[in-house]
């Protein structure tokens, strides 16, 4: 049984990504798009082109048919309902391009766009999409101190030598921040810097004043992490609230599931901050973008504030229903949003792809077994050392001769070591097979369960 249905766009004269819709959402999505097409006089593409101040040719150059539909739903809900849309497209369908289109829409419609995302290195990805939408000259206020926006199309240094000799381990929050900082330093060195965050003192002055310098910035770029200290420092949250009072604000929530989290059974500080903004500034408009928007009930609770769900149930009622109903209830809510034209998800079709060529490497079993045993020997030695260090640390803490120190459980890394080791055993053989197929004129796709970017970055 097919799990997806071919996506039929309302725009017939634009390039298509040949996407599909999950079968359980297909009927609702088709019905919603039909209503939208009828409401717009059968010219969805013309509606979007008009709102983005683009010719039909420019629109078709910038956006695929699927993306035009998503942008049309977002704009229509803002203008006709004062409500939001959840764009839940799979990676590769172009959520970033749709977000950039909404930034352009906001700029041209008298809004102050505020772009939220998960990591500040994604600011440069958004700039790339903004270039494609013809708004590269729009000046962002980068709220994250010390962060730059770079142009990936302008390389200033071809090669970068990595001197790091750190051993990779599963990342915690501090590790992620460190990795982001290292990547930002690499970006700043390797690509042309087009925009920079103001100096920390200047940013602080802007926050305290609660207003943007006149004619200095056109929109904001900010990460969710900027609100993580809002419990003890309300500076940034108050700044955003002040902007919402002074301007017509359009929030573009990229990686929107990151705006809704739970910590120790309670909504995270970031979630509380986002919810406070949405509750106290009902005049603001929003667009949510996330491929995993329904992975947790808390995400849906944040989104419901700006959709038809807000009229159907109170927050507490919906919260109880989602927790009791589990996944089936979340799917039902998703289908309700899709039917209302307030959620859309498109995915890549797997049709037409060649049968994967699996390389089991059985002929190398003895060699790989020997290599695996060598790695495991050293890992066991590290476990012994870790156990010894943990004992020493515990004694030191007992006698108050060491500051609080938490040892990372070495055994917890076994899964990741095994994962990397298996990849390394296969890499050479797979690469050789890929080269051979390329020489035969074939296009090669190497499927991986994980890019392991953290490791590759240091290789």
Language-model region placement:
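N-terminal accessory nucleic-acid engagement/regulatory domains that precede
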Residues: 1-39
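Conserved pre-motif I regulatory segment
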Residues: 29-86
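Conserved helicase/translocase P-loop NTPase motor core
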Residues: 62-80, 215-248, 262, 428
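Walker A/P-loop
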Residues: 82-101
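Conserved Walker A/P-loop ATP-binding site and its immediately adjacent core
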Residues: 96-98, 110-154, 294-299, 450
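Signature of the SF2 helicase/ATPase Hel1-core->accessory helical subdomain module
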Residues: 104-105, 121, 128, 225-344
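Inter-Walker segment of RecA-like/P-loop motor cores
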Residues: 137-232
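Conserved helicase/translocase motor-coupling segment
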Residues: 347-458
């Amino acid at each position: 049984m097919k799990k997806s249905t071919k996506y039929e766009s309302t725009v017939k004269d634009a390039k298509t990504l040949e996407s599909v819709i999950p079968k359980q959402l297909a009927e609702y999505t088709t019905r919603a798009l039909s209503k939208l097409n009828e409401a717009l006089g059968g010219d969805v593409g013309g509606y979007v082109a008009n709102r983005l101040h683009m010719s039909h040719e420019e629109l078709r150059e910038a956006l695929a048919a699927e993306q035009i539909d998503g942008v049309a739903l977002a704009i229509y809900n803002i203008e006709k309902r004062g409500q939001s849309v959840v764009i839940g497209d799979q990676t590769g369908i172009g959520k970033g391009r749709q977000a950039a289109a909404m930034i352009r829409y906001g700029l041209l419609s008298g809004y102050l766009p505020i772009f939220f995302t998960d990591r500040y290195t994604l600011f440069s990805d958004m700039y790339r999409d903004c270039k494609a939408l013809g708004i590269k000259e729009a000046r962002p206020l980068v709220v994250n101190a010390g962060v730059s926006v770079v142009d990936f199309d302008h390389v200033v240094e071809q090669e970068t030598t990595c001197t790091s000799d750190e051993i990779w381990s599963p990342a915690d929050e501090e590790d992620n921040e460190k990795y982001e900082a290292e990547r930002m330093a690499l970006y700043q060195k390797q690509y042309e810097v087009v925009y920079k965050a103001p100096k920390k003192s200047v940013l602080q002055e802007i926050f305290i004043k609660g207003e943007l310098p006149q004619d200095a910035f056109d929109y904001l770029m900010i990460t969710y992490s900027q609100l993580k200290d809002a419990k003890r420092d309300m500076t940034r949250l108050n700044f955003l609230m002040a902007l919402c009072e002074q301007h017509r604000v359009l929030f573009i929530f990229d990686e929107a599931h990151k705006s809704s989290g739970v910590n120790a059974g309670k909504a995270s500080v970031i979630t509380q901050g986002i919810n406070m903004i949405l509750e106290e500034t009902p005049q603001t408009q929003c667009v949510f973008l996330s491929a995993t928007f329904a992975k947790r009930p808390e995400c849906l609770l944040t989104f419901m504030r700006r959709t038809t769900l807000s009229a159907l149930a109170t927050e507490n009622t919906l919260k109880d229903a989602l927790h009791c109903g589990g996944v089936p209830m979340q799917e039902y809510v998703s289908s309700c949003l899709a039917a209302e034209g307030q959620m859309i998800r498109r995915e890549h079709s797997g049709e037409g792809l060649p049968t994967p060529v699996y390389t089991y490497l059985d002929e190398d079993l003895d060699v790989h077994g020997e290599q695996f045993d060598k790695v495991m020997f050293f890992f066991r030695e590290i476990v012994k050392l870790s156990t010894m260090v943990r004992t020493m640390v515990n004694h030191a803490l007992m006698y108050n001769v060491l500051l609080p120190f938490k040892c990372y459980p070495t055994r917890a890394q076994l899964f990741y070591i095994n994962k990397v080791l298996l990849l390394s055993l296969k890499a050479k053989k797979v690469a050789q097979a890929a080269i051979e197929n390329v020489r035969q004129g074939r296009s090669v796709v190497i499927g991986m369960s994980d890019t392991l970017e953290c490791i590759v970055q240091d290789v």
